[in-house]
Amino acid sequence: MKTPTDLTSYIRVLKLASTPTWDEFSKVATIAGLGILLVGFIGFVIFSIMTFVPGGP
């Protein structure tokens, strides 16, 4: 591992990075929230099906 080379590449990435605008942030947050809700809904559906199947928990 070449520490000086790694540090310079990290610094280069940090200089190129910028703070997202409010519009970008809200879009990403909305998509992430919808993804979390979708995964939770799929889990609930699987749990509901397994509850009614004989031999389920």
Swiss-Prot record:
Q: Where in the cell is it found?
A: Cell membrane
Write out the transmembrane intervals.
33-53
Membrane-protein topology = Single-pass membrane protein
Keyword terms: Cell membrane, Membrane, Protein transport, Translocation, Transmembrane, Transmembrane helix, Transport
The record's section on Gene3D superfamilies has: Preprotein translocase SecE subunit
Superkingdom: Archaea
Query: What GO cellular component entries does it have?
Result: plasma membrane
- Coiled-coil segments, which residues? none
- GO MF entries: protein transmembrane transporter activity
A single GO BP annotation from the record?
protein secretion
Function according to Swiss-Prot or TrEMBL: Essential subunit of the Sec protein translocation channel SecYEG. Clamps together the 2 halves of SecY. May contact the channel plug during translocation.
- Family according to the record: Belongs to the SecE/SEC61-gamma family.
Subunit structure of this entry?
Component of the Sec protein translocase complex. Heterotrimer consisting of SecY (alpha), SecG (beta) and SecE (gamma) subunits. The heterotrimers can form oligomers, although 1 heterotrimer is thought to be able to translocate proteins. Interacts with the ribosome. May interact with SecDF, and other proteins may be involved.
Protein name, UniProt field: Protein translocase subunit SecE
